[in-house]
Design a protein with these regions (language model features):
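PLP-dependent amino-acid enzyme catalytic core
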Residues: 1-167
Length: 167
């Protein structure tokens, strides 16, 4: 969904410049990650849709992918470490995905995601290293440009890099 941009009086007064915020927390799954997930799922071939998708996630990418896969009736497995909070696990399950809890860190969970991709032919959808995910995240930048054509600077959070690559 198109999310609003709102003026932040507190931040603007703090730094002495006009600051506006893009409210991606108002997305259906609570974050921008749904943008990339929907785009990636939409670009799967019929054979990929039949085999299903798999991803590694600590929460938001998994929620977005689970939501998108459920919309298209595609099998979805999200691999997570055993240290991920239960509310994130349950949130992903509630959106129709299977969750596999593997190991004490994301590297160990990644091994299971890779195995499913190789052995079961599932399509691995990275939260940041996937051209369709990055293009989907880029819709956020396009919206900002339409909503604020006079914008001079954009500050984009950086974790895996998928959002900033798209924007």
């Amino acid at each position: 969904i198109v999310t609003p941009v709102v003026y932040s009086k507190v931040l603007s007064e703090t730094i002495g410049e006009q600051v506006s915020l893009k409210l991606e927390n108002q997305q259906t799954t609570g974050s921008f990650k749904i943008r990339g997930a929907i785009n990636a799922i939409s670009n799967l071939t019929p054979a990929q849709k039949k085999a299903g998708v798999v991803a590694l996630s600590t929460g938001n990418h998994g929620r977005g992918l689970a939501y998108a896969a459920n919309l298209m009736k595609i099998r979805c497995i999200i691999c997570m470490s055993e240290l991920v909070p239960n509310n994130k696990i349950e949130g992903i399950k509630a959106l129709g995905a299977e969750v596999r809890l593997i190991g004490k860190n994301q590297d160990e969970a990644q091994v299971e995601a890779d195995r499913l991709s190789i052995e079961e032919g599932m399509t691995y959808i990275s939260p940041f290293d996937n051209v369709d995910v990055i293009a989907g995240q880029g819709t956020l930048g396009l919206e900002i440009h339409r909503q604020m054509p006079e914008l001079k600077y954009a500050f984009v959070p950086l974790s895996g890099g998928g959002l900033i690559c798209g924007v």
